[in-house]
Regions:
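Short, conserved beta-strand segments of beta-strand-rich sandwich/propeller modules, principally
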Residues: 72, 133-137
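A cross-family glycoside hydrolase active-site/sugar-binding cleft signature
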Residues: 3-5, 137, 150
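Substrate-binding clefts and catalytic carboxylate motifs of secreted carbohydrate-active enzymes
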Residues: 1-102
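Extracellular and select intracellular beta-sandwich modules with Ser/Thr-enriched
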Residues: 146-152
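Short beta-strand edge segments in extracellular beta-sheet folds
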Residues: 153-157
Length: 157
């Protein structure tokens, strides 16, 4: 059989790591997988993120940028049913809270960034002014209470 580790939302390391629903209650692709295992459901499915790049680099390339640099986040996201997607972005500082396996973590404060353009899942923005480690999060919802999420770590030097 199959079981679900956490049915809900939880801030742990990042706001999108463990929960299978967003903070607003939107279902992620994990819900689709579990529904397929349990029900063989024909529910409207969550969008899918195929790729996320920052300045044409993958998250495995340890992207370092300078303060005030113009950055470009590009994504390849689609919806299985072809629903129109709405895109949201946020930048958070890296989480350094030390907690034990599953203990409560406080949500981090968003970092204000200067957005230059936001078109179809592609964002051009100015890097944060403060040196340190950050993550940029992308959320793509389909207007049907489903969402795809991804994040990209980067360092401002």
């Amino acid at each position: 059989g199959s079981y679900c580790f956490l049915w809900g939302y939880k801030q742990e390391e990042t706001p999108t790591w463990y929960g299978i629903f967003s903070k607003d209650g939107y279902a992620t692709q994990s819900v689709d997988v579990l529904n397929g295992n349990w029900k063989n459901s024909n529910r409207n499915k969550a969008p899918v993120i195929d790729e996320i790049l920052l300045n044409q680099k993958t998250r495995y390339e340890s992207v370092k940028i300078s303060k005030k640099d113009i950055c470009e986040l590009s994504t390849k996201i689609y919806d299985p049913e072809g629903d129109k997607l709405n895109y949201y972005f946020e930048v958070l500082p890296e989480n350094y809270q030390k907690v034990e396996g599953g203990d409560f973590q406080k949500s981090l404060e968003k970092v204000n960034i200067n957005i230059i353009s936001n078109e179809n899942g592609n964002l051009k923005f100015k890097a944060p002014l403060k040196r340190g480690a950050y993550r940029i999060f992308v959320y793509a919802d389909d207007g049907q209470k489903n969402v795809a999420t991804a994040n990209f770590p980067f360092y401002v030097k």
